[in-house]
Amino acid sequence: MKLNALTYLSLATFSLLVYAACSKDAKKDDPSDVPNPVDSAWTTITDSTINTNNLLVNSSTCPNAPNYGDSIVYVKPKQGGDFFANPVNNIGVNGTYFSWPDGLKINKNSGAINLSQSESGVRYNIAFVKKGTKDTCVSQLIVGGLSYMDAIYVLDQNDTLAKPIFNADPFATSVCDASDDTDYPDNNGNGNNKCVFDDDLPGQKANDQKLRVRTKSGIINLKKSVEDGLFGKNPKNGDSKKVQIRYELNDASQKANQKIAVQVVYYDKASNIPGATQQEVASKRANMLTYKIVNGKPRPPLIIIAGLKK
């Protein structure tokens, strides 16, 4: 899928007029090693510094908008070092790159992205300010991979399964096969040729911590996780656990070893979940479902388990 439009975006912190331009280059991303990449300080931009109310579409005014050859880039297996994606435009053009939301490791001088150290499955805004100008050219880029939707799951409503989403598209068909409750490592589950989940060292698997991740589909059985002791024998309101899941996908990432951490929180009843937390989840879900940037910190996904609705 090619970039067909970029955006003007007004950045409140700098009071700059932000322009967007479409990608005209049909080349695929051409990643290469970049020695000692510098993490851009701009990656700390937060919701309060960005005014998205003036988001406009324009396809011709900003040729310096970062172009990585495609709208999705993927980490790939690499021996001896990290894997990078580089912009295919702005060659020889001096300026500064930055990105938001948090999670992208980008060289502020060259625009090189360290995909091995970036959060995957996330949609990012990437901006470039040409030296000697005040024009901030912005484009969107997705780092391919999976995520889980920020959500509240109510077990007594039979809402028990957290399903992965791929390449920041909540409506995309899964690249993995379906599987059931026979598909766990302690039942000799170890994925298949399409997808492998939770292939980690003994004792470090998500399933070893009682987060029941199916190895072929990546689906998390939340009810089984609680029953098997994710939060201990007697979980309490607000109990929380951050768990890492390793995975490999047989897609454009060519089975590169990737990982995602999820934050799982327990409440006895949905009515016990703090209002601010409910609003945070609702806001992130709304952005994800409408293909918008999830500003601030989209990682880790927040999975809230409530035993009862009321």
Mark where each language-model region is.
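Short beta-strand segments within Ig-like beta-sandwich modules, predominantly Fibronectin type-III
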Residues: 103-109
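Solvent-exposed, low-complexity, repeat-rich "mucin-like" stalks and linkers
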Residues: 25-98, 141-210, 255, 260-310
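A short beta-strand micro-motif common to beta-rich folds, especially ectodomain repeats
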Residues: 120-135, 139, 227-251
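Extracellular/luminal low-complexity segments enriched in Ser/Thr/Pro
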Residues: 109-123, 205-240
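Secondary-structure-rich domain cores
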Residues: 96-98, 106, 124-128
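Hydrophobic beta-strand residues in large extracellular and virion-surface proteins
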Residues: 113, 126, 141, 218-220, ...
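Bacterial Sec-dependent N-terminal signal peptides
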Residues: 1-35, 40
